[in-house]
Swiss-Prot record:
UniProt keywords, alphabetically: Cytoplasm, Elongation factor, GTP-binding, Nucleotide-binding, Protein biosynthesis
Protein name: Elongation factor G
Role this protein plays: Catalyzes the GTP-dependent ribosomal translocation step during translation elongation. During this step, the ribosome changes from the pre-translocational (PRE) to the post-translocational (POST) state as the newly formed A-site-bound peptidyl-tRNA and P-site-bound deacylated tRNA move to the P and E sites, respectively. Catalyzes the coordinated movement of the two tRNA molecules, the mRNA and conformational changes in the ribosome.
Annotated ranges, domain tr-type G: 8-283
UniProt binding sites for GTP: 17-24, 81-85, 135-138
Compartments reported by the entry: Cytoplasm
One of the GO biological process terms: ribosome disassembly
Pfam families: EFG_C, EFG_III, EFG_IV, GTP_EFTU, GTP_EFTU_D2
Upper taxonomic lineage: Bacteria, Pseudomonadati, Campylobacterota, Epsilonproteobacteria, Campylobacterales
Major localisation: cytoplasm
GO function terms (MF aspect): GTP binding; GTPase activity; translation elongation factor activity
Family membership: Belongs to the TRAFAC class translation factor GTPase superfamily. Classic translation factor GTPase family. EF-G/EF-2 subfamily.
Length: 692
């Protein structure tokens, strides 16, 4: 089966935006006008084709990047829907990785919002060229020019309008195309499928000329030939203007900007035209970097049909009918269904059972997949997100994706014994799908802990356990692993002697207990001389202490960072045994601990908060209230960075509090750093609570 669409007519694009900018509606309209959907799904009634997971239908927010294929004017557009909520930025990063271009959707009223800043930074990080679509022009308070200024100021970008609105709010009827210098007015009767091209209304002619001049000036800078023509006062042709916009868009020195109202079916066709005119084909983006696994040298993979197959797995989903789907972006060569691929990241071969082209939630079996395509592979067992699939003889490992450490953990308990096993399997599957979600067992409590990127992230995981895997689980309060240690040195003796007819028990030890440096652990030193305790009983003393230290004297938490020296003792020829010395060691340690000024330790997290300057005071005040120690403050990309150590126990609910304190514009990350001493008043509360 030969390739249907040449590589230069393929566009892999993502639609990225802040929650509520109208991103899903825009994707829907694209599918509608390109002839995929017949009835438009609305997010408001939960029928959008892109939003195909059940919870998305309820929450009205898009969670997973469904990859959908559609066609427009002889071009194939592979549309990757990205989530717009801060807890799902990992999904956005993951899709940015495989996009060639993006459409950034902004609300004409809300403008540049917090998540849009995060998503914009991610697109910069991966070098993704983009066009801006200012949506919801029909809403009260719509202001296209306001959004233009915010993009300049907040995102430090160079937006260049290529169309401007005719009217706003309920008088918004169409746009002025600044390239053709014509008015485009949509026809309400045909649900926006038809539009008329007219002369520019006289009251908007001045503004249109002013913005056309700005556009021509911006693109003349992109190319010497255009600059000469412009400076010579010659008129640039439509083709030359388009060429200039494309050069600037691809080198990211300018961002073409359009407007419309997806909900009212206006402006979607002009957006699709801009996607194929200005966003890059796979052949127009920088070659992707990789490593040759044999030589460890850097290699570059060019997007082309020639050469051996190479692709990147960027998303794993469990489909109730087909099983596991692995979404792959193909960078080079082609692959037939039923053939074998080599996973160079894992050094394993796997067979691809079927190849599926996804149309939001419908699927089409295809025989082979070519460079530049995005396709779901069925039948891969060992491949995870971020793995490279390629030809074994021409192996390459494409750039790995980086996944952040979870910032929140909660305990999950299955409601019934029957759920226990199902829960383990289900959590394993969810962790395969989502690399930012982790599962572990807490040694001290034996509970299963799940960790993720935020409270909403974990809520959705628990929700999916119930819906997709039919596992009922209770979630606990977030738990903190405290520790105990000692602050002073003490010597103690303990004699364990039991004589009550028959063979007795006898063990007698003298130990010295001393504090050690934080993080240095446990040390046992044997200073017995002259055989006062026989050699074979020494390990039993050590073992007794190690068992006792799992249960500290303050509140039953493990004791850390101390040294025990066994320096004297005595034994009985008949009654001494390993058991007796183990008990003697354990009792001596407990008595010594009580006298050695025991203290409680808690995990201290290294926290980095990134906020706009106006919220800095509030954020620092809040960290101080949480017993944080501020270490440093820096500037980065017009934002303030606060670095601090904060006790983990004080960080629960922080993402929600930070979001409301900074109107969602603050972001933070945290990781475990060290154990620190709990202040005595707080330690007292913890001990009393623990002893109940």
């Amino acid at each position: 089966m030969a390739r249907k669409t040449p590589l230069n007519r393929i566009r892999n694009i993502g639609i990225a935006a802040h929650i509520d900018a109208g991103k899903t509606t825009t994707s829907e309209r694209i599918l509608f006008y390109t002839g995929v959907s017949h009835k438009i799904g609305e997010v408001h009634d939960g029928a959008a084709t892109m939003d195909w997971m059940e919870q998305e239908k309820e929450r009205g927010i898009t969670i997973t990047s469904a990859a959908t294929t559609c066609f427009w004017k002889d071009h194939q557009i592979n549309l990757i829907d990205t989530p717009g909520h801060v807890d799902f930025t990992i999904e956005v990063e993951r899709s940015m990785r495989v996009l060639d271009g993006a459409v950034s959707v902004f609300c004409s009223v809300g403008g540049v919002q917090p998540q849009s800043e995060t998503v914009w930074r991610q697109a910069n990080k991966y070098g993704v060229p983009r066009i801006v679509f200012v949506n919801k022009m029909d809403r009260i308070g719509a202001n296209f020019y306001n959004v233009e200024n915010q993009i300049k100021q907040r995102l430090k970008a160079n937006p260049v309008p290529i169309n401007i609105p005719i009217g706003a709010e309920d008088t918004f009827i169409g746009v002025i195309d600044l390239v053709q210098m014509k008015a485009i007015v949509w026809n309400n009767e045909t649900m926006g499928a038809k539009y008329d091209v007219e002369e520019i209304p006289s009251d908007l002619l001045e503004r249109a000329k002013e913005y056309r001049e700005k556009l021509v000036e911006a693109i003349a800078e992109q190319d010497e030939a255009l600059m000469e023509k412009y400076l010579g006062g010659e008129e640039l042709s439509v083709e030359e203007i388009k060429k200039g916009i494309k050069i600037g868009c691809l080198n990211m020195s300018l961002v073409p900007m359009l407007c419309g109202s997806s909900f009212k079916n206006k402006g979607v066709q002009t957006l699709l035209d801009a996607v194929i005119d200005y966003l890059p084909a796979p052949t127009e983006v920088v070659d992707i970097k990789g490593i040759d696994p044999k030589t460890e040298e850097e290699v570059f993979v060019k997007s082309s049909d020639d050469g051996e197959f190479a692709g990147l797995a960027f998303k794993i989903m469990t489909d109730p009918f087909v099983g596991q789907l692995t979404f792959v972006r193909v960078y080079r060569g082609k692959l037939e269904s039923g053939s074998y691929v080599y996973n160079s990241t894992k050094d394993k071969k796997e067979r691809v059972g079927r190849l599926l082209k996804m149309h939001s939630n419908k699927r089409e079996d295809i025989k082979e997949v070519y460079a530049g395509e995005i396709c779901a592979f069925v039948g891969l067992k060992d491949t995870l997100t971020g793995d490279t699939l390629c030809d074994e003889k021409n192996a390459v490992v494409l750039e790995r994706m980086e996944f952040p450490e979870p910032v929140i953990h909660i305990a999950v308990e299955p409601k019934t014994k029957a759920d226990q096993e199902k829960m383990g399997v289900a959590l394993g599957k969810l962790a395969e799908e989502d690399p930012s979600f982790r599962v572990m067992t807490q040694e001290e409590t034996g509970q299963t802990l799940i960790g993720g990127m935020g409270e909403l992230h974990l809520e959705i995981i628990v929700d999916r356990l119930k819906r997709e895997f039919k596992v009922e689980a209770e979630i606990g309060q977030p738990q903190v692993a405290f520790r105990e240690t000692i602050r002073s040195s003490v010597s103690k003796e303990h004699k364990y002697a039991k004589q009550s007819g028959g063979r007795g028990q006898y063990g007698h030890v003298f130990i010295k207990l001393e504090p050690k440096e934080p993080g240095s652990g446990y040390e046992f030193v044997n200073e017995i001389s002259g055989g006062v305790i026989p050699k074979e009983y020494i390990p039993a003393v050590d073992k007794g202490i190690q068992e006792a230290m799992q249960n500290g004297v303050l509140a039953g938490y493990p004791v850390v960072d101390f040294k025990v020296t066994l320096y004297d003792g005595s034994y009985h020829d008949v009654d001494s045994s390993e058991m007796a010395f183990k008990i003697a060691g354990s009792m001596a340690f407990k008595e010594a601990s009580r006298a050695a000024n025991p203290v409680l330790l808690e995990p201290m997290m290294k926290v980095e908060v990134e906020v706009p300057e106006e919220y800095m005071g509030d954020v620092i005040g809040d960290l101080n209230r949480r017993r944080g120690q501020i270490n440093s403050m820096d500037d980065r990309l017009g934002l303030k960075i606060v670095n601090a150590f904060v006790p983990l126990v004080e960080m629960f609910g922080y993402s929600t509090d930070l979001r409301s304190a900074t109107q969602g514009r603050g972001t933070y990350s945290m990781e475990f750093d060290h154990y620190g001493e709990v202040p005595s008043n707080i330690a007292k509360e913890i001990v009393e609570k623990r002893k109940g």
